[in-house]
Amino acid sequence: MRINMLFIVAFSFLVSVRSLPMRPTLKYESIFNFGDSLSDTGNFLLSGDVDSPNIGRLPYGQTFFNRSTGRCSDGRLIIDFIAEASGLPYIPPYLQSLRTNDSVDFKRGANFAVAGATANEFSFFKNRGLSVTLLTNKTLDIQLDWFKKLKPSLCKTKPECEQYFRKSLFLVGEIGGNDYNYPLLAFRSFKHAMDLVPFVINKIMDVTSALIEEGAMTLIVPGNLPIGCSAALLERFNDNSGWLYDSRNQCYMPLNNLAKLHNDKLKKGLAALRKKYPYAKIIYADYYSSAMQFFNSPSKYGFTGSVLKACCGGGDGRYNVQPNVRCGEKGSTTCEDPSTYANWDGIHLTEAAYRHIATGLISGRFTMPTYN
């Protein structure tokens, strides 16, 4: 009995530690975020682009918020942990001020990220016959326009803006993952996705440059996650050719090679921007390597359930992914303890996985250069 009680106490302590906020270690007074569903805290839900989306109801948000918030996870995202580490409130979605009657104070930051967003503009995909697959047209350029509209309410004069943005952190991404996901899930070839990489990188460089011209001094630009470990894409490319899977983690190597290509090009682009803007601190965040820690050694990081199988989904197969029965829809099921899973709904990760990635970033271990 005593052993059982000790186990219960230890387990309860572990769960409580996992749910604790990050200890404030960063010194930013405001955060401005641009991206897609990896960092959207409610804009897609507020946009009304899709009627009654599944992310607008439980089990989304069940772990930390106990309600759906528009985040594509069971709880907090990387941006939430960065806000906690900065001693800031969770960054409000920009559309909250436009779609509700709430009075929103953006002085401490604003989140412009939208789930489903792409780096490239809507017409870029339309010209390639992919417009019907897009969830939203709130691209990176549109998010930049939102920031420009908000800026006059944050500071008025050039000296005032310089003072204000000197203490601000800008996150540009992760963005670009959907530029590849849309064609891949639409059964386009790997070559088609590979050919998009230069266009994606150029757009990220353009928007990062524009933000610096607007006054941004410290910017984090994350790379792509190991998409070959994504449950939805693993199901899409379910292949019996064992040699295409990484023996260390069973992730699909061609997809991860695409992510590596994106990240390599991104790092080169950022190196060029550092030369162009030597006064700005431009930081690459290595989401890929940070995530590969738990994909390679799941049990070491507490993922005793699964890292490749989705916690929430409607599939009967290996990855619990069924396009016609998404997480939160009738017929879907949710695992008992999301903290033991890395994949949340097939596309997005769990709060536990995001916390590990955020910890690596905040410590400086997976940023180049460090920013703490």
From Swiss-Prot:
Its main location: secreted. One of its GO terms (molecular function) is hydrolase activity, acting on ester bonds. Its EC number is 3.1.1.-. Residues 1-19 form the signal peptide. Keywords: Glycoprotein, Hydrolase, Lipid degradation, Lipid metabolism, Secreted, Signal. It is found in: Secreted. Glycans are attached at residues 66, 101, 137. The keyword Mitochondrion does not apply. GO terms for biological process: lipid catabolic process. GO terms for cellular component: extracellular region. The active site is at 37 (nucleophile), 345, 348. Belongs to the 'GDSL' lipolytic enzyme family. It holds the Pfam family Lipase_GDSL. It comes from Arabidopsis thaliana (Mouse-ear cress). It comes from the Eukaryota. InterPro entries: GDSL, SGNH_hydro_sf, SGNH_plant_lipase-like. This is GDSL esterase/lipase At5g45910.
